[in-house]
Swiss-Prot record:
Lineage: superkingdom: Eukaryota
Name listed for the protein in its UniProt record: Angiotensinogen
Family: Belongs to the serpin family.
Entry function: Essential component of the renin-angiotensin system (RAS), a potent regulator of blood pressure, body fluid and electrolyte homeostasis.
Classification of source organism: Eukaryota, Metazoa, Chordata, Craniata, Vertebrata
Organism field: Equus caballus (Horse)
GO biological process: positive regulation of epithelial to mesenchymal transition; vasoconstriction
């Protein structure tokens, strides 16, 4: 649940 949404980081910062 982050403001910084990335294609890969989407799973990391769930």
């Amino acid at each position: 649940d982050r403001v910084y949404i990335h294609p890969f980081h989407l799973l990391v910062y769930s």
